[in-house]
Structures are given as structure tokens and as C-alpha cells.
């Protein structure tokens, strides 16, 4: 009654020269099923890490994607998809083209062309008016021709007035130029006056210096004259003293 339960294994399809064994676990174990791959060398591999290490150390074996760890005979869908992607090279996909705008922006050249066309229309309109004057002016000319030479003078005067109104008056421009010249001359005169004033002030300063020198010289002369007079006075006093001494000596001897 207490004998060990026999371990039953089921062989499933596996890669070439490999075996895939399915072992139902004992009752009470964590995993319900267990798959083991048996290598051509007889080594049993029970997890993916062992399989990776074995394939690295033993080159020439099938790819790791061919090993199915499920209990079914066919590999998993992800493995099959990965094999297909590896087998068939992916064609170069062109990037999706961006949708073009419905309204293309107007380029600068087109805008310039429209402007030039608009300017040409205006110029042509002006030329037409010059070639074909308004009806009122044409009627006046016809009337003057019918009335005679007196009326032609009036028409000519009217034309001159129109031309005078159309042509800009050049007088203000000339007046502005003359006013600018006058301002420039005034500024030159002011500068010359300032230089003359500076010269005058310089000459005045020189004169004041000369006057000061003269006053100093005069004071020096006065001092010299006073010193001379003092010397003369001292000499006179000494002569008087000498005379008094001589008279005193003469009286003493007599």
C-alpha cells in the first residue's frame, strides 16, 4: 500500500536531435505540470536559463525560439511570429506622406506679379486719360474753335491753369534752400564774433598783466628811493656827530 508512485512521462514534439518530456507533478506540488528538454548529450534542462547557457556553450543547436515550454505540441504564437519575422526580411516601408493643404499659400512672386499687373492697369488708365481727355474739356475746345480766336485764348489760359495746378510749386523749395543758407551764414558770423570776443578778452588780460608789472616796478623804485634817502640822512647825522666830536676835542686841547 505504501509503495512509491511511478513517474509517468509523455514525449512531445521537439526540435531536431532534442527530446521534450512532459512530467505531471505529484499531488500537492506548486507546479501542476513540468516540461523537460533532453539535449543530444543526454543533459536534462528544466528551465529557460539553463537552456540559454547550454545553447551558448554548445553552438550549432536550434534557436531558443524553437523551444516551446508549454504542454502543446506546437510552439507558442509569439515564438512562431518571431520566427516569421526573422525569416522574412521586412520591406522598406515608406513614411506616410503628409496631407497637403487645400489652399496653397500665395508665393511672393505671384503677389509681386499681381501688384505689377495692378500698376500696369493704373498706368494704362492714366495714358488713356491723357490721350482721351474728358468730355467737358473736349467740348470746350470744340466750342472755342467755332467761336474764333478770342475763345482760343481762354482755352489756353484754362490749360495753363490746369498745368500749374498739376505741377508742384518749386518756390517753397527755393525758399527753404535760401533760409538754410542764411542760417549757415548766421552761424558762421556768430562763431567769428565769439572768436573776436576771445581775442579781445585775451588782449585785456595781457594789458592787465602789463599794468601789474608796471605797478610792481614803480613800487620797487619807490622803495629804492626811500632807502637812498635814509642812507643820506644817516650820512648827514654821522657827519654832524663827527663835527661835534672835533669841536669838542679842539676845545679840550685849547
From Swiss-Prot:
What GO MF annotations does this protein's record show? Answer: methyl-CpG binding
Which Pfam families has this protein been placed in?
Answer: MBD
Q: Does the keyword DNA-binding apply?
A: yes
Looking at the record, the residues that make up the MBD domain are: 4-74
Q: Which residues carry this modification: Phosphoserine?
A: 116
Region Disordered, annotated ranges? 56-254
Q: Which UniProt keywords apply?
A: DNA-binding, Nucleus, Phosphoprotein, Transcription, Transcription regulation
Locations listed in the record: Nucleus
* Tissue specificity: Expressed in leaves (around hydathodes), buds, flowers (carpels and pollen grains), stems (around nodes), siliques, mature seeds and roots.
Cellular-component GO terms for this entry: nucleus
Q: Where is the composition biased (Basic and acidic residues)?
A: 80-97, 107-130, 151-162, 178-254
Knockout phenotype, as recorded, reads: Variety of phenotypic effects, including aerial rosettes, serrated leaves, abnormal position of flowers, fertility problems and late flowering.
State whether keyword Chloroplast applies. no
Q: Which domain of life is it from?
A: Eukaryota
Q: What is its main location?
A: nucleus
What is this protein for, i.e. what is its function? Transcriptional regulator that binds DNA independently of its methylation status. Required during plant organogenesis and development.
Record note on domains: The methyl-CpG-binding domain (MBD) functions both in binding to methylated DNA and in protein interactions.
Protein name as it appears in the record: Methyl-CpG-binding domain-containing protein 11
| Species whose genome carries this gene | Arabidopsis thaliana (Mouse-ear cress)
Amino acid at each position: 500500500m505504501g509503495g512509491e508512485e511511478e513517474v509517468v512521462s509523455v514525449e512531445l514534439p521537439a526540435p531536431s536531435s532534442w527530446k521534450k518530456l512532459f512530467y505531471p507533478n505529484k499531488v500537492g506540488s506548486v507546479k501542476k505540470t513540468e516540461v523537460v528538454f533532453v539535449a543530444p548529450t543526454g543533459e536534462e534542462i528544466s528551465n529557460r536559463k539553463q537552456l540559454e547557457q547550454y545553447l551558448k556553450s554548445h553552438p550549432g543547436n536550434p534557436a531558443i525560439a524553437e523551444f516551446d515550454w508549454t504542454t502543446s505540441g506546437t510552439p507558442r504564437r509569439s515564438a512562431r511570429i518571431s520566427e516569421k519575422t526573422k525569416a522574412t526580411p521586412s520591406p522598406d516601408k515608406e513614411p506616410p506622406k503628409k496631407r497637403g493643404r487645400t489652399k496653397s499659400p500665395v508665393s511672393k512672386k505671384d503677389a509681386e506679379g499681381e501688384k505689377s499687373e495692378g500698376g500696369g492697369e493704373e498706368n494704362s488708365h492714366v495714358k488713356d486719360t491723357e490721350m482721351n481727355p474728358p468730355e467737358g474739356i473736349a467740348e470746350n475746345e470744340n466750342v472755342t474753335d467755332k467761336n474764333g480766336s478770342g475763345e482760343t485764348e481762354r482755352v489756353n489760359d484754362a490749360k495753363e491753369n490746369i498745368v500749374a495746378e498739376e505741377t508742384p510749386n518749386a518756390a517753397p523749395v527755393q525758399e527753404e534752400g535760401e533760409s538754410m543758407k542764411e542760417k549757415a551764414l548766421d552761424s558762421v558770423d556768430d562763431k567769428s564774433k565769439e572768436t573776436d570776443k576771445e581775442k579781445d578778452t585775451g588782449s585785456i588780460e595781457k594789458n592787465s598783466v602789463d599794468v601789474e608789472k608796471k605797478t610792481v616796478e614803480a613800487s620797487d623804485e619807490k622803495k629804492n628811493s626811500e632807502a637812498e634817502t635814509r642812507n643820506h640822512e644817516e650820512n648827514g647825522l654821522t657827519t654832524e656827530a663827527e663835527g661835534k666830536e672835533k669841536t669838542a676835542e679842539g676845545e679840550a686841547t685849547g
